[in-house]
Design a protein with these regions (language model features):
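Aromatic/hydrophobic pocket-lining residues that form π-stacking "cages" and hydrophobic walls in ligand
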Residues: 12, 77, 122
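Alpha-helix N-cap/start motif
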Residues: 60-61, 88
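A short N-terminal helical cap/helix-turn-helix that marks the beginning
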Residues: 3-24
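Structural core segment of the AMP-binding/adenylate-forming
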Residues: 83-154
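Acyl-group handling in specialized metabolite and lipid biosynthesis
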Residues: 1-4, 34
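Conserved AMP-binding/adenylate-forming core of the ANL superfamily
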Residues: 21-59, 65-71, 75-79, 96-101, ...
Length: 154
């Protein structure tokens, strides 16, 4: 099967098998350099998808909004969305809260995944948009959890 005939899930599986221990993504954080291997991205994607399905009871066709700067977890969230059958709604971090509210009111996401830098915005949107049943913080486990209504990546 050629590259053109493969879907995203097939490519994710193939790459995690073929390049398992090779570094797929890396970035500098305030805690130092952070790297994800291909198998690490695949594992994190599957864990997030499992969490979305088993804990948040998302259904195929539900929408997952992502508000975050570019980071390795962003890619894992997109893959998790595909694995769980959700529709990904990537949002530009430069949009105003009113622009975000307008977009999300229209697409009605059930979950918002957000980096810590945009946490306050996500909480505002959760209060304003009835379809949003959960906000998930994408940052590292050492990041402070702001309140009990916010979930964190597994």
């Amino acid at each position: 099967m050629g590259l053109r005939e493969k879907n995203v899930l097939a490519l994710l599986h193939e790459r995690t098998e073929k390049y398992s221990d090779k570094v797929a993504l890396g970035m500098k954080t305030k805690y130092g350099w952070k790297e994800f291997t291909y198998s690490g991205i695949g594992l994190l994607s599957r864990k997030i998808a499992h969490y979305l399905i088993s804990e948040l009871n998302v259904q195929k066709g539900d929408r997952l909004a992502i508000i975050s700067e570019s980071k390795p977890e962003y890619g894992a969230c997109v893959f998790a969305s595909v694995i769980s059958g959700m529709i990904t709604v990537p949002l530009d971090v430069k949009l105003t809260k009113y622009e975000l509210k307008s977009i999300l009111s229209d697409c009605e996401p059930s979950v918002i995944m957000v980096s810590a830098a945009h946490y306050a915005m996500a909480k505002f949107l959760q209060e304003e948009i009835p379809s949003v049943k959960a906000v998930i913080l994408m940052d590292e486990p050492s990041c402070e959890i702001y309140d009990k209504s916010v979930y964190q990546l597994p």
